Amino acid sequence: MAANKGKSQGSLVLHKVIMVGSGGVGKSALTLQFMYDEFVEDYEPTKADSYRKKVVLDGEEVQIDILDTAGQEDYAAIRDNYFRSGEGFLLVFSITEHESFTATAEFREQILRVKSEEDKIPLLVVGNKSDLEERRQVPVDEARGKAEEWGVQYVETSAKTRANVDKVFFDLMREIRAKKMSENKDKNGRKSSKSKKSFKERCCLL
């Protein structure tokens, strides 16, 4: 009998991550660095590119699905559809461009509006291009303060040097996993209380 080589891809837990942020902040560079261990400096923006990879998250084999959305205003109208499909979001700006940091508030509002029925949306604020410290326009304290105000984690990354690239994707997957577990627990709790109620009603009828 052949040894079981682990779960098939179809049966693996899938975590859906959406890359969000202004154009040119390095969303694609972060994605490609995480996926293929390579730094791509010039990348033509498209509506969205989708990537899927099998990874080991805290000892469990899972799949991550990454949707890399374009930051340009031209694509703002179709962004809502992408946001609906996401389970967690990396909200990316460039530490060398304060305008891209300011824009994160608007992107966050859009996410909250689209996911308004959900309680806590897994989201990390990511300050990319940390290798360009001499060109920094966004102080660490300012970015961290905004993230704290929103109740989320702030991490600085460099797609070029790969600093914290794995961290942001894995930390976000952990948040997504925790949310799914909490939701499943709630569902099971509701089912359990319904079955208890149903049992009591049947007992009363006897």
Curated annotation (Swiss-Prot):
Activity regulation field: Alternates between an inactive form bound to GDP and an active form bound to GTP. Activated by a guanine nucleotide-exchange factor (GEF) and inactivated by a GTPase-activating protein (GAP).
In Swiss-Prot or TrEMBL terms, this protein is called Ras-related protein Ral-B
**Species per Swiss-Prot/TrEMBL record:** Mus musculus (Mouse)
**Family statement:** Belongs to the small GTPase superfamily. Ras family.
Q: How is it modified after translation?
A: Prenylation is essential for membrane localization. The farnesylated form confers resistance to the proapoptotic and anti-anchorage-dependent growth effects of some geranylgeranyltransferase I inhibitors.
Task: Please give the subunit comment from the record.
Answer: Interacts with EXOC2/Sec5 and EXOC8/Exo84. Interacts (via effector domain) with RALBP1.
The catalytic activity, as recorded, is: GTP + H2O = GDP + phosphate + H(+)
Q: Which residues form a coiled coil?
A: none
